[in-house]
């Protein structure tokens, strides 16, 4: 993934400041930014690799980890998915109460078959989701995700600039946390454990 342009970096910095300001002073203590009560990120309607339309309601009862990326991403996406796989290992049996979702921002190249191969390679419980160009744009807007195609040497060799953070929902389907890119598996495992314990 290429670095975002200065205006986009400023936009993300502003968003980060807003997210930090939203931290709740009470309740469980999280390592990530507590964004409980946010008015964005309410839901999505996307298809899994089998063509089944999915929304947050399908995963009620589980903590949901939502990440936006693309399969040909050279760094951020595989790093984040590998980190999440390590977090699942740290959670032990509790990992079965967590659903990691990978939403592609490159539906042009990320076919259902490719998502079915790529995403579970990190952990067989991980699920890839996609929509057409309009659904992708609509979902990205709902979750304040920035993405942009960066032309390559050939029409099919483009890359994608995109926001690199991760969202976490509690088992009741409420958006609770924003995890900045670069956080390790212990941060995810710690915060997911707290959300799961609070819902027990």
Where are these regions (language model features)?
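N-terminal secretory signal peptides and thylakoid transit peptides that target proteins
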Residues: 2-18
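C-terminal motif of bacterial Sec signal peptides marking the signal peptidase cleavage site
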Residues: 20-22
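Bacterial signal peptide processing site
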Residues: 24-27
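Short loop/turn microsegments at loop-to-beta-strand junctions
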Residues: 41-42, 64, 163-165
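A short beta-strand-turn-helix
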Residues: 44-64
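Short active-site neighborhood of thiol/selenol oxidoreductases, capturing the structured segment around
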Residues: 57-78, 84
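Structural microenvironment flanking redox-active thiols in thiol-disulfide oxidoreductases
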Residues: 79-139
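Thiol/disulfide oxidoreductase modules built on the thioredoxin-like
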Residues: 135-191
